[in-house]
A protein has these predicted regions:
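ALDH superfamily catalytic-core signature
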Residues: 121-125, 129-140, 155, 159, ...
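Residue-level signal for inorganic ion chemistry
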Residues: 21, 25, 138, 196, ...
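Aldehyde/semialdehyde dehydrogenase
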Residues: 41, 180-199, 203-207, 248-358, ...
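Solvent-exposed alpha-helices and their adjacent loops that cap or buttress functional pockets
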Residues: 97-98, 107-112, 135, 166-170, ...
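C-terminal core of ALDH-fold dehydrogenases
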Residues: 27, 325-425
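A structured beta-alpha segment of the ubiquitous adenosine-cofactor-binding alpha/beta core
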Residues: 70, 101, 105-106, 174-193
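N-terminal Rossmann-like NAD(P)+-binding subdomain of aldehyde/semialdehyde dehydrogenases
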Residues: 1-105, 133
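Conserved small-residue-rich beta-alpha loop and adjacent elements
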Residues: 86, 90-162, 214-216
Length: 425
């Protein structure tokens, strides 16, 4: 059966999935946890095969790190599912209740989007995140992972699909597309697929966006900044910068650029250089920064580069206004932070930086659905429509309007036989 036919079947099954009870959906999530724990050795064995093949093909360390699925990532994935179970049912939530006239009541109610296609590179934990979020939110999900983790993805999908069906959810709730050739066909399934969420490199995401008329939610780059203001606290600044760069260098929310106020550069940069050296961080930057500490000189256009490695670009700026201008010009609208004790400067930075996440005195690595208490995330959206930032349950929901009347007709209001009497319920 072709991917187009599978998507059509899922579209027909999506109302059944949307109407499944919260108890049934949570039961499926519990089965996912049980199956993942019971099948972990099988998962790890499959992942070792993928890692060996990736190493033989010469994939870079940053990609290898994303490919790996170990005890730590399994534990994080299971924690995310447990958190999802603990969250209230997001489906059927009334967000507006209004009486339009006597006996005429309007309600706005949350509902699943329908059929979501998740196309991702490298990260096998994305398979677990999107499957669990889809089940909790009552959506059907088509999952297409990268060839680099085909063995891991195959085992994970088998485990997750069995958990879903064992809770009596529709068998069409989850589907795995395994062939690369299926992607182009999937991108044409406008009548069956409601949303595409790509996760991967800039080139990959741009490729998806340019080849489909289906709505796409996601981000193409993770060029995150930290600006150290003149009113900074050294005891906070250094640990934040080091954490944002090294806690997980291959993550899209890792810091790539450090902006430093000119007034404190001579005091701050030598301390940074020492801390960076201890963590094997390679510093690059402008000529002005290079006059204070040793680093490789780069040009302005190089600040558009996402390193995903132990590399940090450094630039000295005149103040918060230049920092804001640089971030909005060279950034990717993902997550950017300011280190300052001045609440007015922080407020201006957070108001004018055009990013999905703006932080004061905190690491950019906090930009994550699990750390936001969403349970898990399908990705981070840098767009402004529908969802922005880490996309959890709410980003996978739409809404519908339910109107209850007693024989009401518009003509009565058009000819002023009746008048609207709006009242919140």
């Amino acid at each position: 059966m072709s991917i187009k036919e599978e998507a059509a079947k899922m579209k027909l099954a999506s109302p059944l999935m949307a109407s499944a009870s919260a108890e049934k959906r949570n039961s499926a999530l519990l089965h996912m946890i049980e199956n993942l724990e019971a099948g972990k050795e099988k998962i790890f064995a499959a992942n070792r095969i993928d890692l060996a093949a990736a190493k033989a093909s010469g994939l870079p360390p940053a990609v290898m790190k994303r490919l790996a699925f170990d005890e730590g990532k399994l534990a994080d994935s299971i924690s995310g599912i447990r958190q999802l179970i603990s969250l209230p049912d997001p489906v059927g939530k009334v967000t507006l209740a209004r009486q339009l006239d006597e006996g005429l009541r309007l309600y706005r109610v949350t509902c699943p989007i329908g059929v979501i296609a998740m196309i991702f590179e490298a990260r096998p934990d994305a398979m677990i995140q999107i499957s669990s979020l889809a089940v909790k939110s009552g959506n059907c999900a088509i999952l297409k992972g990268g060839k680099e983790t085909k063995e891991t993805n195959r085992v994970l999908f088998s485990i997750l699909h069995e958990a879903s069906t064992s809770a009596n959810l529709p068998s069409e709730a989850l589907f795995q597309a395994e062939q690369h050739s299926e992607i182009d066909e999937l991108l044409t399934c406008r009548e069956s697929v409601d949303l595409i969420i790509p996760r991967g490199s800039n080139t990959f995401v741009q490729h998806i966006m340019s080849r489909t008329n289906i709505p796409v939610m996601g981000h193409a780059d993770g060029i995150c900044h930290i600006y150290v203001d003149k009113d900074y606290d050294m005891a906070k600044a250094i640990p934040i910068v080091i954490d944002a760069k090294t806690q997980y260098t291959a993550a899209c929310n890792a810091a790539e650029t450090l902006l430093v106020h000119r007034d404190i550069a001579k005091d701050f940069l030598p301390v940074l250089e020492k801390a960076a050296g201890e963590k094997n961080i390679h510093l690059r930057g402008t000529k002005e920064a290079g006059e204070i500490i040793p680093l490789n000189i780069i040009e302005n256009d190089d600040f558009r580069h996402e390193y995903l490695d132990l590399v940090l670009a450094v630039k000295i700026v005149s103040g918060v206004e230049e920092a804001i201008d640089h971030i909005n010009r060279y950034g990717s609208h993902h997550t950017d932070a300011i280190i300052t004790e001045n609440i007015n400067t922080a407020a201006r930075f957070m108001q004018l930086v055009d990013s999905a996440g703006v932080y004061q005195n905190a690491s950019t690595r906090f930009a994550d659905g699990f750390r936001y208490g969403f349970g898990a995330e399908v990705g981070i959206s840098t767009g402004k429509l529908h969802a922005r930032g880490p996309v959890g349950l709410e980003g996978l929901l739409s809404y519908k309007y339910k109107l209850f009347g007693k024989g009401h007709i518009v003509e009565d209001y058009a000819c002023h036989k009746k008048d609207f009497h709006f009242k919140e319920l």
